[in-house]
Curated annotation (Swiss-Prot):
This is dTTP/UTP pyrophosphatase. The record marks R19, T77, Q161 as: Important for substrate specificity. Its EC number is 3.6.1.9. Its cofactor is a divalent metal cation. Gene3D superfamilies: 3.90.950.10. CDD domains: Maf (cd00555). It is found in: Cytoplasm. It catalyses: dTTP + H2O = dTMP + diphosphate + H(+); UTP + H2O = UMP + diphosphate + H(+). It is an enzyme of class 3 (hydrolase). GO terms for biological process: nucleotide metabolic process. Nucleoside triphosphate pyrophosphatase that hydrolyzes dTTP and UTP. May have a dual role in cell division arrest and in preventing the incorporation of modified nucleotides into cellular nucleic acids.
Length: 204
């Protein structure tokens, strides 16, 4: 168990993302995963930072209402290029188009993190932003990567943690884990700022 993150109440992850689950496993924090019934529809005009902030809160609240004694964590990640949000590709053709757009340029990855403890009527939400630069990609490289199937369930059409990523990710400015889907340092700082009483280590 992580000595810096020992909670006095259950932690519920309101997410279906295997990457977020893997990150919490990696830092050795016990949690239960729940699927949030939240509607993730937003107006197309919503700015990226506000979109992830809104959706993270929206995902956390119904799960927290069912378990008021637990601390609920929800997150939402989007990729944005020139201010336009790029969600998960609809199909292989869409994924190839996304990668052609993102290759040899910079884009931003936004993740909203929301923590809700319904028992004490507290909510804390934060947004982390990371800049990512992809190198040039040939059409053959794009087709091969998309054919692997990996891009199809990822915002922006690529996964920073994929074994092929070192070949095309040129530079990252900011939190790597944010690009994976859960900014761990931001999560910890938000916990300490708003839920210090639930962190057993903080009172030791």
């Amino acid at each position: 168990m992580n000595p810096l993150l020992q909670l006095s109440c259950p932690l519920l992850l309101a997410s279906q993302s295997p990457r977020r689950r893997a990150l919490l496993d990696r830092i050795d924090v016990p949690f239960e995963a729940r699927v949030s019934p939240a509607d993730e529809t937003l107006a197309p005009s919503v700015a990226p930072a506000e979109a992830v902030r809104t959706l993270a809160r929206r995902k956390a609240r119904p799960v927290a209402a069912d378990r008021p004694s637990a601390l609920v964590l929800a997150a939402d990640t989007v990729v944005a290029h020139d201010g336009e949000i790029l969600n998960k590709p609809e199909d292989s053709s869409h994924a190839r188009a996304m990668l052609r757009r993102l290759q040899d340029t910079s884009h931003a990855v936004y993740t909203g993190v929301s923590l809700v403890h319904a028992g004490s009527d507290r909510t804390a939400t934060a947004v982390e932003t990371t800049a990512v630069v992809l190198g040039p990609l040939s059409d053959a490289e794009i087709r091969a990567y998309v054919a692997s199937g990996s891009p199809l369930d990822k915002a922006g059409g690529y996964g920073i943690q994929d074994h092929t990523a070192p070949f095309f990710v040129e530079r990252i400015e900011g939190d790597y884990y944010n690009v994976v889907g859960l900014p761990l340092r931001r999560l910890y700082r938000t916990l300490r700022a708003s839920f210090a009483d639930l962190l057993e280590a903080s009172s030791a």
